[in-house]
Amino acid sequence: YTWSVFHDVEGLIDLFGSDQKFTIKMDSVFTLPSTIKPGTYGGVIHEMKEMELAGMGQYAHGNQPIQHMPYLYCYAGQPWKTQYWVRQIVERLYNSTEKGYPGDEDQGGMSSWYILSSLGIYAVCPGTDEYVIGSPLFKKATITMENGNKFVIEAPENSKENLYIQSATLNGRLLDKNYIHYDDIAEGGVLKFEMGSQPNKERCTSKYAAPFSLSKE
């Protein structure tokens, strides 16, 4: 539960000491061996086995409390790592076979993560109106609201290789933040991504671009 500070990621970063120390710790989650310690469970439960089979270090997507974690790079100046890991999870852990669902469906968390992340957005912090930017899976997707408004997400160059966001616009204006608001979707419009095969390490790396944290308010 180290990462479960949804309301104040900036405060969590401060406890680590710096953005760099925070992201190094995040990197380690994906690179440590996928070893299992049953602990008080007394045996290996399915979430542990699913983590081992996924082969993403200690990242256990089948256990919902960590599903927001790949998006936290957007708070620490490395959004391209969010883009990389979100696409890895979407493409490697979900598919249309009997093995294509990486865990159980607690309160709709597993499927809603996929739906939102495949669109290129995710609601990290409950109680805010922000959706953090990830990496869209599709070249074009349209969300039709109840009132008939349409929010279109476009990524014409998108492909398995072109998973990194080079630039983004919202209704024709440069999007220089790692998030959009619910009203942007509800009112309708166009979110357009320029995609590429290499990360743009200059885009949206400042604290200005980071999503909501209580420590920033």
Language model segments and positions:
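Beta-strand-rich binding/interaction modules
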Residues: 161-167
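Surface loops and adjacent helix of pleckstrin homology
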Residues: 156, 173, 196
